[in-house]
Amino acid sequence: QDVRVQVLPEVRGQLGGTVELPCHLLPPVPGLHISLVTWQRPDAPANHQNVAAFHPKMGPSFPSPKPGSERLSFVSAKQSTGQDTEAELQDATLALHGLTVEDEGNYTCEFVTLPKGTVRGMTWLRV
């Protein structure tokens, strides 16, 4: 069974406000392993393209200085806390706080999975 990424084509936010960029991997597939979730800005300068990542064991990271870790958070993704707990990465919704004009643009949510490979969806954030 094929999996797909469900995103909204456009999300609108207010300057200074908080916006959520929904991203879900559907449908739930038994035995599907998500090895990494990333959010990228394909139109940004090279060192600002990787906005956020969530690893099943290492948890979240926010490599780009813009928007940066102080303005980003994963809404419901959870990392594995031990051998008996599975990471919960099907919902990779990203919250962006303190919106600025520079935040406007395309955001790509990408799931790296085994055995299905990489699947992605793109959202336009309008501020």
Regions found by a protein language model. Name each.
Residues T118-R120:
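A structural signal for beta-strand boundary/capping segments at domain termini and interdomain linkers
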Residues V19-P28, S35-A44, A95-G98, D103-L114, ...:
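Structural signature of extracellular immunoglobulin-like
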Residues Q1-V3:
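Proline/serine/threonine-rich low-complexity linkers at boundaries of modular beta-sandwich domains
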Residues L8-R12, F54-E104, T113-P115:
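Extracellular beta-strand/loop-rich beta-sandwich domains predominantly from IgSF
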Residues Q14-G16:
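Solvent-exposed, conformationally flexible loop/turn segments
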Residues P27-F74:
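N-terminal V-set
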